[in-house]
From Swiss-Prot:
The chain crosses the membrane at residues 81-101, 105-125, 271-291, 306-326, 718-738, 750-770, 799-819, 860-880, 887-907. The gene is PMR1. This is Calcium-transporting ATPase 1. The active site is at D353. This magnesium-dependent enzyme catalyzes the hydrolysis of ATP coupled with the transport of calcium. Has a role in the secretory pathway. Keywords: ATP-binding, Calcium, Calcium transport, Golgi apparatus, Ion transport, Magnesium, Membrane, Nucleotide-binding, Phosphoprotein, Translocase, Transmembrane, Transmembrane helix, Transport.
Length: 928
């Protein structure tokens, strides 16, 4: 990327010029003390009260950008006319009718125009509101310290003077003057265009003002990402008074591309429009050659165009997708991008993290082992969730008699970044860190971190696989270096081990071998292994290397139980042709143990488990062969995850990938569906993802895939309904015109049919409940078109039935040779009833209404009920009779029409029964 251009396409020079007036330009040249003094805050405890924060918010406003004013409802309503030229033609037809003295026709057409535009306006308004609701589902959050208490708040509530914390993967919530930085580096590429993370410190910036954005090394900008380390900062600018706010107006107009499905609907609409215009043109020409009134033919032609051209398809698709996404959100799955809904139904491989997704992400220490204990059978064992008052007496005795065990617990305590949240009433932080604090209660020990000062830290990373802290009691005593990490990484750093009496002895190769054996045994039981080491002495600040001469303290086995719904979810996914692959940083033995517990399909006699070290050396061909059988990938790195996803995609698979850390972001973005964790996920993972699980539960993915498949089926169902109705309406007028008959439907009736076709019945098909058997069918091919030959065939079949039945009624009603209002009313009502029964048949492409249940879709019942009531009103209400040129029908007439129009549903039910019976017979014959 060009270093002189930001990722949004804003020239860096212009970004700098606009940002010179922001508060960070002044505060970056002040010391921490000067900044805190000016903002009347504390660098360790933040603002003193919420009342003070509220007062500052009244002065500075919320920490958010001003939104553009929405167009008024009146403006949106009248935009319907400019967006649909056919409506303008209808207005012209109404005007011509009025000036020629046909006032009834003019009034009728005008009312129809108002009804059509109102329906379109309501649909579009509903779509926009649904999408607005989606955008509000993932509010940005900030980690705030106020009055010394840590809490998570909405970033929009921050004010200047607030103290915020940030660590790897977090997005900076406001412009901050950094007051603490531990190996802190921040990715500012989305602001400055520089892709290399910037190392941050707390020192004031020197130089002649104005100081450029890239030179403010003590400032963390809103919207930038923490790539390494952690820190705290005082908020100095919020909302429009941030560097991002200065250029917000230049990047706020971002057009949202249409989803592939919406694009295909647009193309389908254009194709159908061309066909419809062709048919309508032929109808009008034939009518004029037959000597019919040109105004009548023009009005009918335009009305047919309005009814036959499915201009409402893209809107209904959007509404259906949006409502489906909102339903997913109630099931704890937040879809950030609408195209993801379409892709969900095609997913056939899920690459899932183990921790927190397949398991509960609540670690408990179950095993403590030190070198002097010898075999694993002598290790201290604990029951998850057990407090120290109920601990095994042997465990308490072991602590009293073993300094090495006490030292191991101490290292786990000091090398720890979890914190107690007073408001929530529990510890927050990394699951492993929380377990290492909770285990202290088992032995009646206290958290001693408040009595010691941390003077150095090397944060854990997936590449290092270890973490280090250096702490001191604050006096002249020698600092203590505490290290924890993977056993195979920590053991080589150690030169000594701690004996039972607290003395140290050389840590030789035999002991290293013993540690490896014990770790392997613990891994086979499904435990995560953490090794601990320590050393008395100073650690050089800024160093990234592990110190020499460490003392090995011991091993702990942590257990993270599987989530209860995961085995069922895996079975359901496997049945539906979706393969589940576990990707974890744990050892192969631990991963295999968990995989068996959750019921992963592990193929006997094949290489089901592959370690990251082997993966790194595999060629593409070897990887392709490996992916055919491997179900578990252990000890993986972020690069390994990328390689796995690319490998599956190379095979033609549609891949969903779960992740929560900043190192998962590349794989999340590469996958066809990136799924981030809502509770434990970092901001960068959430931003890279297409979907967020608010409960971090793997079973939620099953619900999302089911919903995705169901939504696509529903879209096909209402397309079937709309197209078959359009084809029938065109065919009826075309056949009548060719046969030299008067048109059976007048313009008002045609427009009424259009309202029913694009209105409630069609939309209610979009919210049909998901078929329980949807996971018994394989995933939909990625490039499968919406319009399949079977769908077109069904549309034609339904249209032919409606055409034949409606024309039969029309012809039989005019046996006297005169066409009156009763004849057209019977024909019109017959077509509308056909419409309702056709909608009933379209509720499922394969199942009978008796299987899915008459009352399972209440929205459908309400929609059809309202449509039928509307039709009866058109037939029986005097005012509407004059508008639609109808007359009252007898009960006998209505019953006969119901009997005739139900044929489209009855024949569809018979076809479904026949196909199902044939499928059953074919299976029976194949197994007999």
């Amino acid at each position: 990327m060009d270093s002189h251009t930001s990722t949004e396409g804003v020239p860096l020079s212009e970004t700098n010029n606009r940002s010179h007036a922001t508060p960070s330009a002044q505060y970056c040249q002040m010391t921490v003390e000067e900044t805190c003094s000016k903002l009347q805050t504390n660098p360790e405890t933040g603002l003193t009260s919420s009342q003070e924060a509220m007062h500052r918010r009244d002065i500075h406003g919320s920490n958010e950008f001003a939104q553009e004013e929405e167009d008024s409802l009146i403006k949106k309503f009248f935009e319907q006319f400019s967006e649909n030229p056919l409506l303008l033609l209808l207005i012209g037809a109404a005007a011509v009718s009025f000036f020629m003295g046909n006032h009834d026709d003019a009034i009728s057409i005008t009312l129809a125009i108002l009804i059509v535009t109102t329906v379109g306006f309501v649909q579009e308004y509903r779509s926009e509101k649904s999408l607005e609701a989606l955008n509000k589902l993932v509010p940005p959050e900030a980690h705030l310290i106020r009055a010394g208490n840590s809490q998570t708040v909405l970033a929009s509530t921050l004010v200047p003077g607030d103290l915020v914390e940030f660590s790897v993967g977090d997005r900076i919530p406001a412009d901050c003057r950094i007051v603490k930085a531990v190996h802190l580096s921040i990715d500012e590429s989305n602001l400055t265009g520089e892709t290399t993370p910037v190392t941050k410190d707390t020192n004031p910036v020197t130089g002649t003002p104005p100081i450029g954005l890239a030179d403010r090394t003590n400032t963390a900008y809103m919207g930038t990402l923490v790539r390494d380390g952690n820190g705290t900062g005082i908020v100095v600018g919020t909302g429009s008074h941030t560097a991002f706010g200065a250029v917000y107006d230049m990047v706020s107009e971002i057009s949202t591309p249409k989803t592939p499905l919406q694009a295909s609907m647009d193309n389908l609409g254009k194709d159908l429009s061309l066909v419809s215009f062709g048919v309508i043109g032929v109808i009008c020409l034939i009518g004029m050659f037959q000597g019919r009134d040109w105004l009548e033919m023009f009005t009918i032609g335009v009305s047919l165009a309005v009814a036959a051209i499915p201009e409402g398809l893209p809107i209904i698709v959007t509404v259906t997708l949006a409502l489906g996404v909102l339903r997913m959100s109630r099931q704890k799955a937040i879809v950030r991008k609408l195209p993801s809904v379409e892709t969900l139904g095609s997913v056939n491989v899920i690459c899932s993290d183990k921790t927190g997704t397949l398991t509960r992400n609540h670690m408990s220490c179950t095993t403590c082992w030190t070198v002097d204990m010898g075999d694993l059978a002598n290790a201290v064992t604990l029951k998850p969730g057990q407090s120290h008052t109920e601990a095994d007496p042997k465990a308490v005795a072991a602590l009293k008699n073993s300094v090495s065990l006490a030292n191991m617990l101490k290292v786990g305590n000091l090398c720890n970044n979890s914190k107690f949240n007073r408001e929530a009433g529990h510890l927050v932080g990394n699951a492993t860190d929380i377990a290492l604090i909770e285990v202290l209660d088992y032995f009646g020990l206290e958290d001693t971190r408040e009595t010691r000062k941390r003077v150095a830290e090397v944060p854990f990373s997936s590449s290092r696989k270890w973490m280090l802290t250096s702490t001191t009691t604050g006096d002249s005593s020698t600092p203590m270096i505490s290290v924890k990490g993977a056993g195979e990484v920590i053991a080589p750093f150690c030169e000594y081990y701690c004996k039972k009496d607290g003395k140290t002895a050389p840590f030789n190769d035999d002991m290293r071998k013993k540690v490896t054996e014990i770790a392997s045994e613990m891994s086979n039981d499904g435990l995560r292994i953490i090794a601990f080491a320590y050393k008395q002495g100073k650690y050089e600040e800024g160093s990234e290397e592990a110190p020499e001469g460490l003392v090995f303290a011991g091993l702990m086995g942590l257990y993270d139980p599987p989530r209860p719904d995961v085995p069922r979810a895996i079975r359901r996914l496997t049945t539906g042709g979706v393969r589940v692959v576990m990707i974890t940083g744990d050892s192969a033995a631990t991963a295999l143990s968990i995989g068996r517990r959750i019921g992963m399909p592990l193929m006997p006699g094949t290489q089901s488990v592959v370690e990251g070290s082997k993966l790194a050396t595999m060629s593409d061909q070897a990887l392709d062969e490996c992916l055919q059988t491997a179900s578990i990938f252990a000890r993986t790195s972020p690069e390994d995850k990328m390689k796995i996803v690319k490998g599956f995609q190379r095979r033609g698979d549609v891949v969903a990938m779960t992740g929560d850390g900043v190192n998962d972001a590349p794989a999340l973005k590469l996958a066809d569906i990136g799924i981030a964790m809502g509770q434990g996920g970092t901001d960068v993972a959430k931003e890279a993802a297409d979907m967020i699980l608010t409960d971090d539960d793997f079973a939620t993915i099953l619900s999302a895939i089911e919903e995705g498949k169901g939504i696509f089926n529903n879209i096909r169902n209402f397309i079937t309904f709309q197209l078959s109705t359009s084809m029938a309406a065109l065919s009826i007028v075309a056949v009548a015109t060719i046969m030299g008959l008067e048109n059976p439907l007048n313009p008002m009736q045609i427009l009424w049919i259009n309202i029913l076709m694009d209105g409630p019945p069609a939309q209610s098909l979009g919210v049909e409940p998901v078929d329980p058997d949807v996971m018994n069918k394989p995933p939909r091919p990625r490039n499968e078109k919406v319009m399949t030959p079977d769908l077109v065939k069904k549309c034609v079949e339904a249209a032919v039935i409606i055409l034949v039945g409606t024309m039969l009624v029309y012809v039989t009603q005019m046996q006297d040779g005169v066409i009156d209002k009763r004849d057209t009313t019977m024909t019109f009502t017959c077509f509308v009833f056909y419409d309702m029964f056709n909608a009933l048949a379209c509720r499922s492409a394969t199942k009978s209404v008796f299987e899915i249940g008459f009352f399972s879709n209440k929205m459908f019942l309400y929609a059809c009920g309202a449509s039928i009531i509307g039709q009866l009103a058109v037939v029986y209400v005097p005012f509407l009779q004059s508008v639609f040129q109808t007359e009252a029908l007898s009960v006998k007439d209505l019953l006969s029409l119901v009997l005739i129009s139900s044929s489209v549903w009855i024949l569809d039910e018979a076809k479904k029964y026949f196909l199902k019976s044939r499928s059953t017979n074919n299976y029976t014959n194949s197994v007999v």
